[in-house]
Regions:
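Active-site core of glycosidic bond-cleaving carbohydrate-active enzymes
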Residues: 20, 24-31, 52, 56-89, ...
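Residue register of alpha-helical TPR repeats
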Residues: 1-4, 69
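Glycine-rich, acidic and aromatic/proline-enriched surface loops and short helix-turn segments
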Residues: 2, 31-39, 139
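A short, charged helix-loop
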Residues: 42, 47-52
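Hydrophobic or amphipathic alpha-helical targeting/insertion segments
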Residues: 9-12
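Short amphipathic coiled-coil heptad-repeat segments
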Residues: 101-106
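Substrate-binding cleft and catalytic face of glycoside hydrolase catalytic domains
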Residues: 7, 23, 27, 36
Length: 197
């Protein structure tokens, strides 16, 4: 999460000196995540944004998609900073491999939708299935958008954290909206937005 946030912050801020100061942190975090890759090529992690309030398995969709986005952001930031092209090419190759691993490990049918399992063995829809959409992974966008907007997750208050629960979180609702827009479903995202304004 730090690599993703720091790289995106540096790119948005546009301050070369500050970006150069943050670059070693980004590199360190990317290397840490790389060393946490499982045999399936996704990031091993026993926690996520919800800090243990819901099950996450040994590797979760949110952590791996944030690492994917961090790799892509580091490619852009590295190019801006004049980092050796071999390093940015390595990050780009790692991102491509991770995209394939995310689909292979997390992709599947959940609740009748062609979408993502939040972790291996998960059988309930989770609001954070929006994460691949946010980072530009579109292989399962149609099913994921349908799942996010379906009755299993959608409530008058926003998206449920997990199908069948009563917990919702504004952050995942806003992330889902962003992901639906990014996946190219502006009409559905617009309808979604109007429900909450």
């Amino acid at each position: 999460m730090i690599a993703c946030g720091a790289a995106r912050y540096a790119l948005a801020r546009g301050d070369r000196a500050e970006a150069a100061e943050l670059w070693p942190l980004v590199e360190w975090c990317l290397e840490y995540c790389r060393r946490q890759l499982t045999a399936d090529g996704v990031v091993a992690s026993d926690t996520d944004e919800l800090e243990g309030r819901f099950p996450t398995g040994d590797a979760n969709l949110c952590t791996s998609t944030l690492y994917y986005d961090a790799l892509l952001s580091a490619v852009s930031l590295g190019r801006e900073l004049g980092v050796e092209s071999a390093q940015t090419a390595r990050y780009a190759a790692q991102a491509r491999a991770l995209a394939r691993a995310i689909d292979a490990h997390f992709g599947g049918e959940v609740g009748g939708y062609d979408t993502y399992r939040y972790y291996a063995g998960n059988t309930l829809l989770r609001s954070w299935i929006c994460m691949p959409l946010i980072v530009g992974l579109k292989e399962r966008s149609e099913g994921t958008v349908r799942a996010l907007l379906g009755p299993e997750l959608m409530t008058d208050d926003g998206l449920l954290t997990q199908q069948g629960s009563s917990t919702f979180w504004d952050r995942s609702t806003l992330y889902a909206l962003r992901g639906i827009f990014r996946a190219g479903y502006a009409d559905k995202a617009g309808d979604f937005l109007h429900r909450f304004t």
